[in-house]
Design a protein with these regions (language model features):
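Predominantly extracellular/luminal regions of secreted and cell-surface proteins
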Residues: 4-48
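Solvent-exposed serine/threonine-rich low-complexity stretches and specific carbohydrate-binding patches
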Residues: 114-124
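Short, surface-exposed linear segments at secondary-structure transitions and domain or protein termini
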Residues: 20-28, 122-131
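Aromatic, loop-rich ligand-recognition surfaces of beta-strand-rich domains
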Residues: 1-6, 48-116, 130-183
Length: 183
């Protein structure tokens, strides 16, 4: 289910994240060498991820208490009123969908103002693999810098939700995010 990305303010924009990416999902066409395009990576390349493929998903191993922060410089003051992103459910691979999202705007990239936040609820089975799409809408705001903070989906139990390993009994779920869009 791919909506046209026209009007998406973030397409092709470079961004920063506060975590190192595992899978970087940076692919422009099927023949592109994964990792070849360093400018936009997988979160603003106009490609939606799906259940069946690990591209163009971007994976983040989350540390408890530290939300994923995604920051885009929009070049000039731009009106924003909606953010959309995808996240993946696949507990066997230690992945849960996002549990919350917050949006902050800034004129200078230093002082940010939080303009919206939302808790996200997903119905999912014990096992399997599902791609969820979430959105958050808010009063139109001016942003030169847009920050999207995404909360991971909680914790998973070693040997219960995923195959037992020597790691800790309870781990923070990884976040696999796809195509953050703003309108």
């Amino acid at each position: 289910e791919t909506e046209p990305l026209y009007g998406n303010l973030l397409t092709g924009k470079s961004y920063t994240v506060n975590y190192t990416m595992g899978w970087t999902g940076d692919i422009f066409d099927e023949n592109d060498v994964l990792g070849a395009d360093k400018t936009t990576f997988g979160l603003t390349n106009g490609k939606r991820g799906n259940n069946a493929s690990y591209t163009p998903w971007c994976s983040f191993g989350i540390v408890e208490g530290k939300d994923l922060e995604f920051i885009v410089h929009l070049d000039k003051p731009t009106q924003v009123s909606k953010v959309i992103f995808g996240s993946l459910f696949n507990p066997a691979m230690r992945i849960l969908p996002a549990e919350g999202v917050a949006v902050e705007v800034s004129a200078d990239g230093k002082q940010y103002t939080r303009i919206a936040e939302k808790a996200l609820k997903h119905d999912y089975p014990e096992t399997g693999r599902i791609a969820f799409t979430d959105s958050i809408e808010f009063e139109p705001a001016q942003a030169t810098f847009l920050k999207v903070k995404i909360k991971n989906g909680g914790t998973l139990r070693n040997g219960v939700n995923f195959e037992k390993n020597n790691g800790p009994e309870i781990i923070p779920a990884e976040l696999w995010i796809d195509e953050i869009e703003a309108y």
